[in-house]
Amino acid sequence: MDQPSGRSFMQVLCEKYSPENFPYRRGPGVGVHVPATPQGSPMKDRLNLPSVLVLNSCGITCAGDEREIAAFCAHVSELDLSDNKLQDWHEVSKIVSNVPQLEFLNLSSNPLSLSVLERTCAGSFSGVRKLVLNNSKASWETVHTILQELPELEELFLCLNDYETVSCPSVCCHSLKLLHITDNNLQDWTEIRKLGVMFPSLDTLVLANNHLNAIEEPADSLARLFPNLRSISLHKSGLQSWEDIDKLNSFPKLEEVRLLGIPLLQPYTTEERRKLVVARLPSVSKLNGSVVTDGEREDSERFFIRYYVDVPQEEVPFRYHELITKYGKLEPLAEVDLRPQSSAKVEVHFNDQVEEMSIRLDQTVAELKKQLKTLVQLPTSSMLLYYFDHEAPFGPEEMKYSSRALHSFGIRDGDKIFVESKTK
């Protein structure tokens, strides 16, 4: 069903949070009393508003009465206006300027690229710490204006905005700690490096689903560009070289990396991918969302040495030599056949006779008795069988259950089977 068009923020607010749709809550619920209004006003005498308002996909195009917004929203700290029809920044400003406690604002999927954001409008956002502009097609000029007027902005979401380039403002933003800029088309490192210039305090950079093809930057320059970067996501980027992975070591504070779905790792098995990456990134404590334990790191580094042990010296990565210094040269792991043994050579003892024979371990005790019938000259019903493990400290074990498979005894070459007669 299509959303009605031309609706105001206040109209939707009153409808959604009326007592009929949003019953009064005790405790943290906030009851807002509104003075009597002219006849025909959609406002109720009393609304119950939480501090987090979710008004997404409501067809909102404008603010409505600003006095009413101020009366209702003085306590509101989070506001989700995503997927509405707001296309004028002035209308957004009318809403936000009357929500003095606002810290989180989501304007995703509103057609705001159709208007210019003036600094006077952006100034009404000054207290916002987290701003979401996904799929808003916000221009870099708009982003620059926001950065100038939001001195406390810590988290910015610019996903799905069709960016192919990055434009730097005249002044950098020191407050921003987290930037989500996924699902754009930022292929060249020359564009990504601008983000380091713009946001020198950046802690988390999420670049997933861009097509970045290489990290073309000297190691010392990387450290200066992103001195505080702790976490980076390169999920589904276009990286194709191990040199690009090695360059991540140049970020002095990097602890967390996401690298799933990149062309470089496609030829490797799941085990090889993780171990080879862990071994190359000694400072990373979390890879693809999973903690790297000390035990996993040592296993990965030893695996790395063995993986490259037979590679020509000119092709061996530098990290290999570092790990050789740490662990020394390691011999290849012995290949152990873990398949169950199918037969065993055992000694069969009966009276004073000893006969060496090969027995199938997939047969049952009853079938073994049939095999021994000719040798010991006893009917199967008169046989008592005992199994003796030549390496075990215990005595013989009676093989009393006819349907039990021989492999369940753990029979190996050199073990003994004793046969006695029940009539003995």
From Swiss-Prot:
Where in the cell? Cytoplasm, Cytoskeleton
Keyword S-adenosyl-L-methionine assigned: no
In terms of domain of life, where is this protein from?
Eukaryota
Q: Residues in domain Ubiquitin-like?
A: 334-424
In the record for this protein, the LRR repeats are positioned at 73-98, 99-123, 124-147, 152-173, 175-196, 201-222, 228-249
Q: Does the keyword Repeat apply?
A: yes
Name the keywords, alphabetized: Coiled coil, Cytoplasm, Cytoskeleton, Leucine-rich repeat, Phosphoprotein, Repeat
**Ranges where the LRRCT domain occurs:** 262-303
- Pfam families assigned to the protein according to its UniProt record, in alphabetical order: LRR_9 (PF14580), Ubiquitin_2 (PF14560)
SS bond list: none
Query: In terms of one coarse class, where is the protein primarily found?
Result: cytoplasm
One GO cellular component assignment for this chain's record is: cytoplasm
State the SUPFAM superfamilies in the record: L domain-like, Ubiquitin-like
Give the coiled coil ranges: 349-375
- Residue numbers of Phosphoserine PTMs: 18, 41
What role does it play?
Answer: Acts as a regulator of tubulin stability.
- What this protein is called in its record is Tubulin-specific chaperone cofactor E-like protein
Provenance organism = Mus musculus
- List the gene name: Tbcel
